[in-house]
Amino acid sequence: MIDLLSEYRMDPTTWLYVASLMTIGIYFRFHRLLSIRNLDLIGLIAFAPGLLLIFHGIEAQGYLWLIAVSLLFLPRLLIDPAFSRRPLTEPNLAPGGMAFMAAALMFFLTANILTDRAVFAGGPAAGGGSDKVAAVRRVPMTRGPGFMPFYRAISLTRDHPGGIPPGETGGEAKDQRSAPSLVLRAGVKAVAIVCQFAIVLGMLFFGLRHFDNIQTGLAAASLYLLLPYTSLMTVRLDHLVPAAFVVWALASYRRPVIAGMSLGAAAGIAFYPFFLVPLWIGFYWRRGAVRFGVGVLTALIVLIIILLCLPSDMRQLQLDLAAMFGKGLFRSEGADGFWEFYPAVLRIPLIATLAVLAGSLALWPAEKNLGNLLSGTAALLLVAQLCLIHQSGLYMAWYAPALILVVFRPALEDRTAVRAVPPRPFGALPRLREP
């Protein structure tokens, strides 16, 4: 099977045109050209040129393009709760055709992951290309803040130039490295596939349980799979793992403990989802805040226990604990991506803006509904990934699923914590009217 897929590769530029035309044909509302839905779709398509510029080595302009499009979406997300009339708008494709397309896209995405050659930091680029372009598709060697053992495990960097320690022949080094490198390569790809399935299934579940319409969830998941970003950044676990946890935190919002554990895991791994915690506490303030806090603390305690169980000295343990809770947030050395070409000092007011935005969304409005939670989560993660010192603007998986769900969501005014969350931790879920 792998041999049959080994030559599978679609040029990114070709896929940009194909995916853009499919997005317009399937989702565009041709009878209302200036609708919010159509503008959202045009905005999602507009990310693709920036990605192509980056993958063709024109990084300064490419990252600037991504940042600009991201900032255009920010006011759209902040004013989304004001759009009270949200009629259900189905895609232009029948449910059976939509399901087939989603399954086909997932199959080819899996094939893309299995045949990806840009897993090791010293490996060749998938489909050729320069080392600079290939590096975009691999985890940066120096990271932080976050769960550093996770980043060390998925970076897969070699300790010596060319991967061959001094004093060893190429054959000896190959014998010593072949088994672990195969295991690590297979492990990264397996986790990437699991994360992509988790994101897609989470969006399907969200549509079924919270929109009461499986076709809407299917349309949202298919649009995520159609994004050129999804096919280009296939094995970046620093993108996918936090994204999968955030999606399932949203999907399980009616169970505060589970939502808290999912969000706590995302925050413990990538740190920046910590900025979501005030918003979620504000959502659960009238019911479920304590349970949500218990879930977040449980996930963080589990990650700390994992740190304690890993073989390391006390100094390394202290550094990893500090990085997990924000040490290195304002670090500017080793910048790559957007902040490699533009003054990194601008990150400081950007991080301050993120903190102010997190506090503001936590306080207003006083009673939040699921629509506020969705749009606020997408907005905060959109700004958070702009603050990254590494490849700022490229971490679209963090916010893209929530953003797409915002695009498709119906009216959700009655989905408040008081109405949707059971009064007891393991109580039956209250019955809600259809949106």
PLM-predicted stretches and their roles:
Residues 260-263, 396-401, 414-418:
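Composition- and surface-driven signal marking solvent-exposed, interaction-prone regions
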